[in-house]
Amino acid sequence: MPLSTSLLGKKSTYKDSYDVTLLFKIPRINNRNELGINSNNLPFYGVDVWNTYELSCLNKNGKPWVGVGTFYIPTDSENIVESKSFKLYLNSFNNFVVESVKELERIILQDLSNVTHAKVTGRIFSINTKVEFGVPSGKNIDDLDIVCNNYGAPDNSLIEYEDVLVEEEINSNLLKSNCLVTGQPDWGTIVIKYKGKKLKYDSFLKYLISFRNCNEFAEQCAERIFTDIKNAISPDFLSIYIVYARRGGIDICPYRSTDKSYTLPSDKRFIRQ
C-alpha cells in the first residue's frame, strides 16, 4: 500500500477494541533502492529498537494494567511499521482483556512478526521497573567551533578523513531530521564506532548537521549515514547507533553494524528518552 494511505499525518480515531489491522507496513526496499543498498545482500546487520511508553490492557477482572515495552525489529525484515499505526495499534489494547502480561507480549510479538515478515523479539515490563539513564559512549564532537551553512539535504561530500588508521568511538547529540510525512522533528543522538581511516571531526560534524531539514524516516537516516561513512573510508569495522527522542509515546533507535555478532552499545535510555 502507498504511504499516502497510512494514518500518519491524518486525524485518527482510537479504536475501542484490539485491532491488528491498524498496523501499517512499509517495505524497506523502496528507501534502500534510493541508497543503492541491495536488499538481498545487505552491507550490515542490526535491529531497530522500538521503546513504547503507552501500553495498557485489562486483566480478567477488568482491572487496568499499564507498562512499557521494548521491541527489536531485525534489519533484514521485509517491512518496517509506520510509527503512528503502531501507536494506534498499541492503544487498541486499552479495553482488551488478557490472561497475563506474557499473553499480551506474545500477541504483540506475533503481530509484529507477521507484519514485518521477520522474527521480532522484545519484552513488556512494569512501569515500576527501575530505569537508569546512560550517556553516549565515546568522544563527543559537538563542541567544535565550526561554521555551518548546509541544511538543505544530507551532503556526503562533507565527509573528510585523515590518512591514518584508527579504532575509535565518537558521538554527537546534534543530529536532527524531520518525519517524511508530517515534517515533525526527530532529535537524535548518534554513536559511531569504527576501525579505519580517521574521520575529520569538524567536517563530519558538518555532515551530520546537514541532515537538519532532511525529510526521511529514522531507519533511512541511519542507513544513509552508515552507507556514506562506509563509502567514504571503507572501514574494516563500522557500527552506528542512533537514539531518537521520544515522540508520540514511542522512540525508535536504529542500530547498524558490519559485525554479524553485534551487541548494542547500551540498553540504558539517554536523557531525551
UniProtKB/Swiss-Prot annotation:
<feature type="active site" description="Proton donor">
    <location>
        <position position="186"/>
    </location>
</feature>
<dbReference type="GO" id="GO:0008616">
    <property type="term" value="P:queuosine biosynthetic process"/>
</dbReference>
<dbReference type="InterPro" id="IPR016428">
    <property type="entry name" value="QueF_type2"/>
</dbReference>
<feature type="binding site">
    <location>
        <begin position="81"/>
        <end position="83"/>
    </location>
    <ligand>
        <name>substrate</name>
    </ligand>
</feature>
<dbReference type="GO" id="GO:0006400">
    <property type="term" value="P:tRNA modification"/>
</dbReference>
<dbReference type="Pfam" id="PF14819">
    <property type="entry name" value="QueF_N"/>
</dbReference>
<dbReference type="Pfam" id="PF14489">
    <property type="entry name" value="QueF"/>
</dbReference>
<keyword id="KW-0560">Oxidoreductase</keyword>
<feature type="binding site">
    <location>
        <begin position="247"/>
        <end position="248"/>
    </location>
    <ligand>
        <name>NADPH</name>
    </ligand>
</feature>
<dbReference type="InterPro" id="IPR029500">
    <property type="entry name" value="QueF"/>
</dbReference>
<keyword id="KW-0521">NADP</keyword>
<dbReference type="InterPro" id="IPR050084">
    <property type="entry name" value="NADPH_dep_7-cyano-7-deazaG_red"/>
</dbReference>
<dbReference type="GO" id="GO:0033739">
    <property type="term" value="F:preQ1 synthase activity"/>
</dbReference>
<keyword id="KW-0671">Queuosine biosynthesis</keyword>
<feature type="active site" description="Thioimide intermediate">
    <location>
        <position position="179"/>
    </location>
</feature>
<comment type="pathway">
    <text>tRNA modification; tRNA-queuosine biosynthesis.</text>
</comment>
<comment type="similarity">
    <text>Belongs to the GTP cyclohydrolase I family. QueF type 2 subfamily.</text>
</comment>
<feature type="binding site">
    <location>
        <begin position="218"/>
        <end position="219"/>
    </location>
    <ligand>
        <name>substrate</name>
    </ligand>
</feature>
<dbReference type="InterPro" id="IPR029139">
    <property type="entry name" value="QueF_N"/>
</dbReference>
<protein>
    <recommendedName>
        <fullName>NADPH-dependent 7-cyano-7-deazaguanine reductase</fullName>
        <ecNumber>1.7.1.13</ecNumber>
    </recommendedName>
</protein>
<dbReference type="GO" id="GO:0005737">
    <property type="term" value="C:cytoplasm"/>
</dbReference>
<comment type="function">
    <text>Catalyzes the NADPH-dependent reduction of 7-cyano-7-deazaguanine (preQ0) to 7-aminomethyl-7-deazaguanine (preQ1).</text>
</comment>
<dbReference type="InterPro" id="IPR043133">
    <property type="entry name" value="GTP-CH-I_C/QueF"/>
</dbReference>
<comment type="subunit">
    <text>Homodimer.</text>
</comment>
<keyword id="KW-0963">Cytoplasm</keyword>
<feature type="binding site">
    <location>
        <begin position="83"/>
        <end position="84"/>
    </location>
    <ligand>
        <name>NADPH</name>
    </ligand>
</feature>
